[in-house]
Amino acid sequence: MILVSQLRWDDWNRAHIAKHGITPEQVEEVCQGPYIVRQGYKGRLMVIGPDGAGRALVAVLDPEGTDAYYTVSARPASRRERQIYQREKGGGAP
């Protein structure tokens, strides 16, 4: 499993995820909980998992060294992404 121990934040990515109704705290919760990882575009990672309230989110992360990632985007998970998560994690929410 890929370990996401540190997320990098700046004004741009905070404003960008706010457009999707997501907070940095929610992204941090996703990366601390039971998540799955998919390869994304340009070597980025798509992290799918629940926030603290159980809402399924997708965080797009760009690797920046060992276990550190720049948050490119975050948004609510699509129905398909929620199904993939449930299948890999054994059912249940999100």
Protein language model features and the residues they cover:
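Ribonuclease/tRNase effector modules and their secretory precursors
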Residues: 1-94
